[in-house]
Amino acid sequence: MADIKIDSKVFQERVSHFYNAWKADKRSGDALFGGVSSIVILMGKVDENPEFHKNNAIHFWLLGYEFPTTLMLFTLDTIYILTTQKKAKYLDQVKGGRYPVEVLVRGKDAAENEKLFIKITDAIKAAGKKVGVLTKDTSKGPFIDEWKKVYADNCKDVEEVDVAQALSAGAFSVKDETELRAMRTSSKACVALLTPYFLDEMSNILDQDKKIKHSALADKVFNKLEDDKFWKTVELPNRQKLPADLDPEQLDWILGPIVQSGGKFDLKWQADSDNDILHPGIIIAAMGLRYKSYCSQIARTFMVDPNKSQESNYKFLLAVHNLILKEIRDGAIVKDVYTKAYNFVRSKKPDLEKHFLKNVGFGIGLENKDPTLILNNKNTRTLKDGMTLVVTTGFSDIQNPNPQDKNSKVYSLILSDTIRVTSSEPVVFTGEAPVDVDATSFFFKDEEEAQPTPKKEKRDSRVGAVATKNITSTRLRSERNTTVDEDADKRRREHQKELAQKKQKEGLAKYAESTADENGVEIKKFKRFESYKRDNQFPPKVKDMGIVIDQKNATIVLPVMGRPVPFHINTIKNASKSDEGEWSFLRINFLSPGQGVGRKDEQPFEDASAHFVRSLTFKSTDGDRYADIANQISNLKRDAVKKEQEKKDMEDVVEQDKLVEIRNRRPAVLDNVFIRPAMEGKRVPGKVEIHQNGIRYQSPLSTTQRVDILFSNVRHLFFQPCQHELIVIIHIHLKDPIIIGNKKKTKDVQFYREATDIQFDETGNRKRKYRYGDEDEFEAEQEERRRRAELDRLFKSFAEKIAEAGRNEGIEVDMPLRDLGFNGVPFRSNVYIQPTTECLIQITEPPFMVITLEDIEVAHLERVQFGLKNFDLVFVFKDFTRPPYHINTIPVESLEDVKEFLDSSDIAFSEGPLNLNWGVIMKTVTANTHQFFLDGGWGFLQNDSDDDEVEEEEEESAFEIDESELEDASESSEEDSEYDSNASEEASDEAEDSEEEEGEDWDELERKAKKRDRESGFDDEEERAAPKKRRK
């Protein structure tokens, strides 16, 4: 114990925390501490196999070490510590704080030792009539026996009160950041031993059909704890390594490892692994570790060749486990959590009710199991932010309806995770160990019968679905050739045929029955409009029997046969005023069936066969009043249509939950950034903060000018560096749109900072007189490179922090792959479009484009024909009600790269020479999707593509185009592309110019060109370009 150093600051902080809880309980009625005025903690002789209870825990919590044969007495005024001389010199380090500490040293003289014990008993009696003790304390040894004798003689009138729960609530259960860090580390160490180490060992044993005892496999895992090399090199399932500051020497076992299989399961972990042979069926593994005195546990169920019943029950176990995790939060009552889980089991699968465990976990920390914090249906304790629990969900001894052998008749299922309670969903410290069915199921029986799958090319982890071979170190757009690799083209055609067949099969399976109503044209419903519920709600002016416009209720009250009749504005089509002599006429037209064939006139009616009044006409000599009424009706109609449209636009806007702010520490901040879409008011940079369940952008202009984005609403997170760009970007694509600023609806929120500063021209500056050459320009360039690199590092680091904070929602940082990008026109301007692992994006300038690849049903390349300089790309989504997405005017040089990108992303595509009417096509698809796939589905696109390719080959072999015809073709191609509404304005302008200008005769142009070519030695390419250049 020569190097023992007690942290006196931590000691005083924790003593203060404990005393504050004690005094607060006294003020509020002694509900927790039971009115005790002193507390005695005893530590006896250390056992060979120590069990950690609250007496050990108080030592570790306050001192960081365990001091055997030591007595601690806490009174409201003083802390007394009675120990040996050797230990006393270390305890002198904690003296001198807010709460006085008196260290009493015992020696070998029994009489002197008895006097010290009497001094302690006198302090207990002086403090009050109630003393707090640990009634279940099992401390043993001569020291304990001596104390009990003196205590029995001197404290006969003192009442003992069990303070186990008080110590748990006031000291151990809520952890500080240092304690939580130790628990996170011990949890990750548990994960590392379970997955990958135990999982790999178990898989190899089963794969090679070896016979091994449970105890032997457990010993392998047990001995791995001493392997320092393992701890330095092991990777967790999420490819992360353990913390660099991990000290393997401070790791120790608290549970197991326990391995169970073959129908014998004990989910209370009361026995070590037995000597039975590992049975390939249901296998349970559980283990627990201690790191820096803080414990964690984990347990997983692995299934080998499970039947449908076992898979179903495991999925249900996972659902119950997730339900419990969602219910655990700050303020929840323990028994309520268990009751909700129990009721869920009873309602969904009543046959499993009797197999459900009697508790769903317990508190953990310095104690490997806090007996005062058992998660059962009797515990009334309230969970608090900072508590750590082991959540255990299990079903024991379930009967197997289809046992494969005698050892498979009965099985159990269990999941155990160490978690931290927060104000929202808990943080699962052992969450890196997978729990889904695919990760925990192993199939060996059908392995030989399975068809061999073709070996996939190894892909870079950053690239994902994008083909790796498209990435080269020095490939520029200008260097891309348009020649086609025949082998690659053949391979791509074969792959595309497979994808097309797969899409057709999926479509037939998904839409096995007619879906005209579900996925077809939306059926409009008849809406009832009630202007007034009672007569007394009519406007007072109706007594005059005139036409009254009620703006408040959006109603026009008309006099009909001496009675006021209300008409809601939505029943009126329009109103008009006309003059005839001295009379003015007001005509009000109503909506009725059969008025038109346009989409706007498709108005639903309750009974279309009923009689309808189509119009009412009123006449008067007061023309000005009629003009005013007609104007008011038109304005009211316009406002109603606008309001209805706004309501429709906001239908998909989902109200987010509240952002839970971090209170106990400063949140991670990225300062001096702009947001897009921009907020109201002056454009000024704000800051982005990472909180518990989301991020917040705060404008410096006002505290109300802020944008909250929850992690649960984030679908994609992108970081785009400032290389080749003027700004560095963190871009968030949302699942559901949110409102920003003045009712701006958006699914994309972006934070950016400009990467370049304003440059000053210093020509003629005094400084330039004394500096020659370009040294200053070189320095400025170097400085800009450094600034850009620093900006990239800063934004990338912050994006990774966002992903880390939202890892429970599956958020990962994605970066665009610039080398695979291409130019195109998704909206009005020509932009550079780049693929990422999961998307195709353009986030440099608004409007932004984010297309998720997994949402795409098929892609179609339009205007792919000889002579055209560009083509269009159309994406059809799996949600057929969503309009297809067009990217126009892509240079033909990018055609092969786009095809390769689509093919490597497993997107079925086709091509054709013309632009298709996608509105009509999608209307056909949605009208009856079942029939659409029966008729061949998307095959009609592929058939057109194949026909075009055959025709093109025949044309190429039949004749050779000359220069003049090539010019004509290129002009006409520009004209053909003009009708696409989304084509670039530049292309349209060029086409119009070529139509309007008149050039020389073609024969004359050709003669002159040949003559000039002979004189200057130009090649064919320049010969073709010369006439066109002259016409421009």
Swiss-Prot record:
Residues 446-513, 943-1032 are annotated as: Disordered. Residues 485-506, 624-658, 785-805, 949-1010 form a coiled coil. Residues 476-508 have a biased composition (Basic and acidic residues). Its main location: nucleus. Gene3D superfamilies: 2.30.29.150, Creatinase/methionine aminopeptidase superfamily, Creatinase/prolidase N-terminal domain, FACT complex subunit Spt16p/Cdc68p, Pleckstrin-homology domain (PH domain)/Phosphotyrosine-binding domain (PTB). Keywords: Chromosome, Coiled coil, DNA damage, DNA repair, DNA replication, Nucleus, Transcription, Transcription regulation. GO terms for cellular component: FACT complex. SUPFAM superfamilies: Creatinase/aminopeptidase (SSF55920). PANTHER family: CDC68 RELATED (PTHR13980), FACT COMPLEX SUBUNIT SPT16 (PTHR13980:SF15). Component of the FACT complex, a general chromatin factor that acts to reorganize nucleosomes. The FACT complex is involved in multiple processes that require DNA as a template such as mRNA elongation, DNA replication and DNA repair. During transcription elongation the FACT complex acts as a histone chaperone that both destabilizes and restores nucleosomal structure. Belongs to the peptidase M24 family. SPT16 subfamily. This is FACT complex subunit ctc-2. It comes from Neurospora crassa (strain ATCC 24698 / 74-OR23-1A / CBS 708.71 / DSM 1257 / FGSC 987). The lineage of its organism: Eukaryota, Fungi, Dikarya, Ascomycota, Pezizomycotina.
